[in-house]
Amino acid sequence: MDFEKYGAYILEETAALLNIDSPSGMTHKAAEHVKARFEALGYPCEITRKHGVFVNLGGEDKENGLLLEVHMDTLGGMIATIKPNGRLKITAIGGLNANNVETENCRVITREGDVYEGVAQLVNASIHVNGEYNDTKRTFDTVEVLLDEDVKSAEDVKKLGVRVGDYVCFDPRVRITKSGYIKSRFLDDKLSVGILLGYAKYLKDEGITPKRAVYAHITSYEEVGHGGCTNVPDGVTEAIVVDMGCVGEGLECDERMVSICAKDRSGPFDYDVTNGLIAAAKKMGANYAVDVYPFYSSDVAKTLTAGYDVRHGLIGAGVYASHGYERSHVDGALATLKVLAGYIE
């Protein structure tokens, strides 16, 4: 089977989704987009109450169903204070880190739908003026958002319709290189949505009906901890998360591999499911690594704590610099696709 033909499709779908702002709690536009993309492939799907997307990928045995969980929500910011000088103090949505957004362009989206450009900068950001520039710890007390508007006071900002509670969305800066790398904010976990679309297209192209019912839940609150709590159909016995694979010191995975997670901070994954994923990687010739993630949790942890009696596992394309300006590779995406194809028969 020539899986490589799905590489360009996966990256194109990923890039399109990356360019739609979708911080946790504001995923409605992304949900409409994802729903339309699955429907274009011929799959029935619906938008959930929490603005996720639920997809029925078909399959025979509905008493031994498999749920695939990925998330389309991302990190972001929200205005916490409009300062007297017209600058904005923000609060993080999810694990947004001030170090990683300093100097990044952003958009403030008001509750009425107006959009204003801005940039995140250190307070007193001119190094020729600020003698403490190098020594200042970057937090959201010291990194602020400047609107690209002629505002000098809180009143000026409010005249624009900007208010506390408005979302701040950071530029993903999507780049796809000739060598197959994809660089962007929020590859966690929009790359996995692209991979899942690639898997859905593979099933259609090959005319495959899985032996077991397969569902997908593209969640909308993973980054804040309650994405996978709901939408587990009756008859589902396994839930497998497709989320970013960790890349870093002490781990074996890199961006051109699929990572199979044996344990994260929530504990070990199901023994048989993990073994099955490893066996699928070997069978399909996928370049893989088995790793332990020390500071990681996923949708399926919330599925379990919500009380669902399912076996669980986790795989994902290797992604470097998580929660920052992330990097992965088409080979890692294709390796993940191969494992899905090999595991779900």
Where is each model-derived feature located?
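N-terminal hydrophobic/helix-forming segments and targeting peptides
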Residues: 1-345
